[in-house]
Design a protein with these regions (language model features):
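Aromatic-residue-lined binding/catalytic grooves and analogous aromatic/hydrophobic interfacial grooves
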Residues: 208, 852, 992
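Detector for glycine-centered tight turns/loop "hinges" at secondary-structure junctions
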Residues: 57, 80, 206, 395-397, ...
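Acidic, glycine-rich flexible loop segments
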Residues: 380-409
Length: 994
């Protein structure tokens, strides 16, 4: 019996790895004693002891340790420790564990420490999906998961910047990445909605509606994206834009560990607008006035000594029945401008306890985070480009009476105290009862809270106060969000022969509450009060009105959900799900929606032709169909609302506020649906060295919600919200991972992520509601040239609309093609009309997104190099339109006004002359790390690293940076002027485990 047990240990280690936590310490010692006893007659050499840990320094429990070429081996205990008796000199130890790459080491002395690296191509990896988990190889839908070890290194503002470029089909838009108070916009597989939002649902540790700012980057274990409709349909009304599942780190059974993960950082300005210096300004600009100073306004706004640091300390561990993890975090970062700053303090904890002979599991999560923000005004950077560079940096009087078109950009920031205090909290409790080995039920109750208090005080020396003739202006705003979640699930699994079936059913209730209050006053006796004594101001007292407002709203959803997973002999797999959901936002006749989904996969690699293949390890073809919904529009728009109609003065009653019908109700307003189709292939080749996926998808938006004009009467208002439009998105995605070189001392792996996406508005109208087109936001003054984008039936999202450039006349005035017909008649751009406008070539949506990651390891060093880029899209460059022409009514200008654009002497016109290629390729991240071998019992793992972000960018775009331009939503590709500087970031970090 002992002999068979030892053989099982060596040859069936995968089984024992799973069973290892169940063994007691005595059983493990017995195993080692028995194994060495049977082999003692063969090996009479020395005893080797050691520890096996993962890359974070945590012990690996149940790892196989064997002398290569023999059956002499053992497994690690709860602390990751092992002892091998009778180990010959120069023996090679093979260390393996499921999910990790096998390591071979030659002990130096009688003690050894082995660090296992995770296997990125591991097919047995467990991936979190909606309301459950799945083995990676059994997925039937388009799901991509990124583990923390594969995150981009360095400083980030939010979690999605860790995986920017890591997931095909996911666009992370960080237009002001160096502003510590900014966050990213996220889009999955294109934009499809006009009014109900295009952002994905965020789920943190199973809690839908999570906030990515309420989590430290060091606490995240993985980020998983559910991309196709079948994967996301289980979330119903909020799954149409994809679902992002964030899983935080958990404790492990074994020795309690303490870890520290921190870094310091500094930002450098990567690129500045090329404006005229004072001498060039005086020499070139007609009517230029020299005020005697030489001021680089843009440079004056830059905080050259900015500094940031981030510290995270975690305590984790547990026993066979209880695991826990507690972490605390402090983060502070100064922005690239002279006023912005952010301080964050966070606490997060989780636990799980198993009792009653593994029948009862209880667990929970708790987190609290507070962020203190000092905010900036991006408009100052626009002003810094256009302002006379010969003014003093303290000048104020010269700008009085300018109507806000000209002002001192430095004083605009320093003479204003603007910020916010934000509190994030989350708590949930989970209880799971394992009724039978294959039947369980679980209950989750959770609460998420977010409180935000904004304050904005403009000192008496602020430009607005000077022009208005009052002493100070104070404004405060308080917002509170409270979400409650109650969910019940039941799971049943059974196997009959080669048929495995899993059934899940559940109920979900969510309640979303929002409250807002704001107040303002001005003309204070002193600036010392700031926003702390609004009653001291006298402006609102003069006419008896209160300068305050408040609002409150609520939304509720109820859902019944179910899912079936079927697996026939790992050859055929099927998943079907259904969610029936009700939402209070919709009309009385359409409050409930049904969201079905189905997906299937065929493991082609199990065919006889592949049985002896040395190339194909796993090959799977899958197809999915799913219906999801959207509910991201304003609450109560289906109902008749009364709203304020302004203030009216009565000699008898004083000021009276009027109320009346605020909208046209639509009791038939229903669900905006998205129907998704996905065809995919998952592959693992060449002994797991090459792996990845290929997906083709179509997403059709139906009953898209929009605002439509209606006649007066019978309607009281000009517009009504209705389900009319249709949209479509199409594309493909490729992910490929290749372990190119694997030797004892050196490894090289590379991965490519490629996606192609197009989105189109198919139809606006039906027989009842008609809408010819909608225009994007108009361009600002001076000039008010109108909008550069238009959507109508059949046009791609992000289409540009304007005049076709035909050169200039003898006076340098811009000419356009009449009727937009190139080669025909030309006319002055200033005389152009609607009949001369056409759709211009290209859209503001990148069709192609590409990233290329490379990871090298040599002994104790690791190096990662990451490129990413976006291609085949255009940017309407407002910088060139407003500051790159000689006649523009601003003081200073870009050098291009007298160089590339010197031939243009007339005013700006929205035409394709200013429509530029937005393509770029960026060396986005280089990280060099060192993990020294330490012969100490106090430190289990130490890693030092340095990261540089935004190393260089290759682009033809002449604006500040193509990444500052929004490429998500309905109106992408407008290169605005309120642009925050882009940074080149340098980070030094330390990761220690004790």
């Amino acid at each position: 019996m002992k002999k068979n047990f030892v053989n099982l240990t060596m040859r069936g280690g995968g089984i024992l790895c799973l069973l290892a936590p169940m063994f007691s310490a005595n059983a493990e010692n017995s195993l080692r004693t028995d194994a060495s006893f049977n082999l003692s007659s063969v090996y009479q050499d020395e005893r080797i002891s050691g520890t096996v840990v993962d890359q974070e320094g945590n012990p690996v429990i149940g790892a196989n340790v064997i002398i290569k070429g023999t059956q002499n081996g053992t497994i690690t205990d709860l602390d990751g420790k092992f002892i091998l008796e009778n180990c010959p000199a120069n023996a090679i130890l093979q260390v393996s564990y499921i999910g990790y790459q096998t390591q071979e080491v030659v002990p130096e002395g009688t003690s050894v420490k082995v660090t296992l690296r995770e296997d990125s191509q591991n097919l047995e990896e467990v991936v979190v999906v909606g309301y459950g988990s799945s083995v990676k190889k059994d997925l039937t839908t388009a799901v991509t998961s990124v583990k923390s070890k594969d995150f981009l290194q360095g400083a980030v503002n939010d979690a999605m910047q860790l995986v920017d470029g890591k997931v095909a089909g996911v666009t992370v838009n960080s237009t002001a990445a160096s502003d510590p108070n900014s966050s990213s916009s996220i889009q999955v597989r294109g934009a499809s909605s006009l009014k109900a939002g295009n952002s994905p649902l965020i789920v943190i540790d199973g809690m839908p509606g999570g906030d990515l700012r309420n989590i430290a980057q060091q606490d995240i274990e993985s980020i998983t994206v559910l991309k196709d409709g079948s994967a996301a349909a289980i979330y119903g009304s909020r799954g149409a834009n994809g679902v992002i599942l964030v899983t935080t780190k958990q404790g492990r059974a074994g020795k309690t560990t303490i870890s520290y993960d921190g870094y310091v950082e500094h930002d450098f300005v990567a690129n500045k607008p090329d404006v005229l210096d004072p001498d060039a300004y005086l020499a070139n600009v007609t009517g230029a006035v020299d005020h005697g100073y030489r001021t680089d306004w843009y440079d004056e706004l830059i905080n050259k000594n900015n500094f940031g640091h981030n510290h995270n300390i975690a305590l984790a561990g547990g026993s066979e029945s209880t695991i826990f993890r507690i972490s605390t975090n402090f983060k502070q970062k100064e922005g690239l401008d002279i006023v912005s700053k952010r301080k964050e303090y966070g606490l997060r904890g989780n636990f799980k306890h198993i009792t009653l002979e593994d029948r009862l599991e209880v667990g929970g999560n708790i987190s609290y985070r507070i962020a203190d923000e000092d905010c900036t005004d991006y408009g100052s950077f626009k002003q810094a480009v256009q302002l006379n560079p010969t003014y003093s940096v303290d000048e104020m009087e010269a700008f009085q009476g300018s109507g806000g078109y000209s002002y001192n950009p430095v004083k605009n920031l320093t003479e204003r105290d603007r910020g916010a205090l934000q509190e994030y909290s989350m708590v949930d409790f989970n209880i799971k009862l394992n009724i039978l080995d294959n039947l369980n039920t679980e209950l989750k109750l959770g609460r998420q809270g977010h409180n935000k208090k904004e304050q904005d005080y403009k000192y008496s020396t602020f430009r607005e106060c000077i022009d208005g003739g009052y002493h100070g202006h104070a404004y405060i705003k308080q917002e509170n969000w409270t979400d409650w979640t109650l969910e019940w699930l039941g799971n049943y699994e059974f196997t009959i022969g080669k048929h495995n079936t899993k059934i899940m059913g559940g109920y979900s209730y969510q309640e979303f509450n929002y409250e807002e209050f704001d107040a303002e006053n001005r003309n204070f006796p002193t600036d010392a009060f700031l926003t702390n004594n609004l009653g001291a101001g006298d402006y609102q007292k003069l006419d008896g009105r209160l300068g305050m407002n408040s609002t409150k709203n609520q939304e509720k959803t109820i859902a019944f959900l179910g899912r079936v997973n079927y697996n026939y002999n790992d050859l055929f797999l099927f998943t079907g799900s259904l969610r029936y959901e009700g939402n209070t936002k919709f009309g009385a006749d359409n409050k409930w929606g049904l969201f079905p989904a189905a997906s299937a996969a065929w493991r082609v690699s199990k065919l006889p032709v592949f049985e002896s293949s040395s190339v194909v390890d796993d090959l799977k073809v899958r197809f999915s169909y799913g219906v999801t919904g959207r509910s991201g529009f304003d609450k109560y728009i289906s109902l008749a609302k009364y709203t304020g109609y302004g203030d009216y003065y009565s000699d008898r009653f004083g000021w009276i506020k009027g109320y009346g019908p605020g909208n046209n109700p639509n009791y038939d307003l229903g669900w905006e649906k998205q129907v998704s189709y996905n065809l995919g292939i998952d592959y693992t080749l060449f002994k797991s060295r090459l792996s990845g996926s290929l997906d083709l998808f179509i997403r059709d938006g139906r009953d898209v919600i929009g605002d439509y004009k209606v006649p007066l009467p019978p309607y009281l208002h000009e517009t009504i919200t209705a389900n009319v439009g249709t949209t479509t998105s199409k594309g493909f995605e490729l992910q490929a991972n290749w372990d190119a070189v694997q030797t004892k001392d050196f490894t090289y792996s590379t991965n490519v992520v490629l996606s192609y996406t197009t989105s189109k508005l198919k139809s606006f109208s039906n027989e009842k509601y008609q809408l010819g087109y909608i225009d994007g936001d108009g361009f600002p003054s001076p000039g008010n040239p109108g909008s550069a984008q238009r959507l109508q039936d059949g046009t791609p999202i992000g289409s540009f609309y304007g005049f076709k450039y035909a050169g200039v006349d003898e006076n340098g005035q811009i000419l356009i093609w009449e009727g937009g017909k190139e080669g025909g008649t030309t006319k002055l751009g200033a005389d152009g009309n609607e009949q001369d406008k056409v759709y211009l070539d290209g859209t503001g949506v990148p069709k192609w997104e590409l990233s290329w990651g490379n990871t090298f390891t040599y002994k104790n060093f690791d190096l990662s190099i990451f490129f990413r880029g976006r291609f085949d899209y255009k940017i309407m460059n407002q910088y060139e339109m407003y500051y790159g022409l000689q006649v523009i009514a601003v003081d200073n200008k870009l050098t291009s006004a007298y160089e590339e654009n010197a031939h243009i002497k007339g005013p700006k016109v929205i035409c394709d002359y200013f429509l530029q290629n937005g393509n770029y390729l960026r060396l986005d991240n280089i990280t060099l790390g060192w993990t020294p071998k330490l012969n100490t019992k106090w430190i289990s793992n130490l890693r030092l690293y340095a990261t540089i972000k935004n190393v260089f960018t290759l682009t033809k775009y002449t604006g500040v940076d193509p990444t500052t331009v929004t490429t998500t939503g309905l109106w992408p590709g407008i290169g605005g002027m309120d642009v925050y500087p882009t940074a080149r970031n340098l980070t030094f970090g330390v990761q220690i485990s004790y």
